[in-house]
Amino acid sequence: MCRFLLAASFIFSGFVKAVDPLGFQYKIQDYLTAFGMASWFPSFFPLLGGIVLSAVEFFIGISLFFATRRTLATSLALMLMIFMTPLTLYLAIFDPVSDCGCFGDAWVLTNWETFGKNIILLFAAIMAFRHRRMLIRFISVKMEWLVSLYTLFFVFTLSFYCLDRLPVLDFRPYKIGKNILLSLIHI
């Protein structure tokens, strides 16, 4: 159960960030500015970092779902949750960034909602890591490399396609084809 909860969360999070790499770039810039670190990194870093982080999240999610690369996937999930949980507590208390951006514009959570979500996911990551050898594989060990390679190819291709064109799924409130006047009325 913990494995599938983690997998769904990481797949969804990685996918929505990969679909809108520019949106995630802006969120990373918000974080760097809020923590006074914007000048520490070159201008391309938020975009490149966003694409890599979305790919890592998507890879972790697919790996957890199929139980491939079990040690790597559970270790990365646990490390991410150990880092993100205290960070979201800080965000919830001091509110330097309005929302976490963990699910892009697809599902906007408050900082306190994000902290609660991360507590649950941290527990799930601990359980998945502790029982990683007991995770039942959905594919053979010989096919692990193919699933891993395809996963990374898919998510990077998706990110660069959406960067070059428009997002294939647009979660923004003022997406193309939407009546802006009606959107403003419902706010």
Please give the residue ranges for each predicted region.
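Membrane-interface helix-boundary motifs at transmembrane edges
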Residues: 66-73, 133-143
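Functionalized membrane-embedded alpha-helices
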Residues: 1-18, 46-87, 122
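Membrane-embedded alpha-helical segments of integral membrane proteins
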Residues: 82-135
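Solvent-exposed, well-ordered loop and adjacent helix/strand elements within mature globular domains
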Residues: 13-53
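Internal/C-terminal transmembrane anchor helices
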Residues: 139-167
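Alpha-helical transmembrane signal-anchor/signal-peptide segments
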Residues: 164-183
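Conserved small/polar residues in nucleotide/adenosyl-binding loops
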Residues: 185-187
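Membrane-interfacial loop-to-transmembrane-helix junctions in polytopic alpha-helical membrane proteins
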Residues: 38-45, 49, 69-72, 106-113
